């Protein structure tokens, strides 16, 4: 069982390039980061010092202006391809396991056709990809906003290197029952993110048996990362009891 710290959300008490070392010291097995484009690649490589990177996102565009990626936006195909190549180069330099392809804000049949075509094109490079449904409350207008929608598209495309990014918090926010979402889509999921529900703080609670979930992943054939993407209630280190508890339980049951 491998746990990754999301450096965009955790260890924010320190500068970004100090966070990989802090995550390593805290007992994580690796890291992920949303947008590793604000620092030169050599600086990232020095900061990571060989620490594994589970996932990065494609560039979102101007976040403050509401942009959330371009994969599903008709007419933005050239922008998507430029940004994807940037992500591909950065993933290679960081040795990132997966790239999360951000869909952007769009809707309707033309947006879906654009998303499908861009995913097929991106998958042709052979780097493992993910797509992540984001809930409409926090990401209004985002094209991919339902796990069943994501599954339908991926099943139709049949691209083995493209999987669902299962975010426990978003799954609960969208569908109510995150366990039921996982039961439907576990086989399609290639990356897992965890957080507490409903406050998106430390993992656990919300009626979801997190220990049973993580402990059961190997038996279900899941060999990917479990990434912590949450907002610490206080400082990051004081809230890592969940990591110790999950490691202890999983060690006891042989996972």
Stretches found by the model and what they are:
Residues 70-163, 253-254:
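Active-site acidic/histidine proton-transfer and metal-coordination neighborhood
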Residues 9-11, 35-37, 59-61, 103-107, ...:
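Active-site-proximal loop/turn and secondary-structure-junction residues that shape catalytic pockets
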Residues 29-30, 52, 97, 128, ...:
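Residue-level detector of anion-binding/catalytic polar loops
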Residues 38-47:
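Active-site-adjacent beta->alpha loops and helix N-cap segments on the catalytic face
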Residues 1-8, 55-71, 134:
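N-terminal small/glycine-rich loop or linker at the start of catalytic domains
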Residues 1-4, 8-9, 13-27, 86-89, ...:
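Histidine-acidic metal/acid-base catalytic patches
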Residues 32, 54-57, 100, 130, ...:
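Conserved beta-strand positions in the central sheet of alpha/beta enzyme cores
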Residues 19-22, 32-36, 68-69, 76, ...:
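Alpha/beta catalytic barrel-like cores
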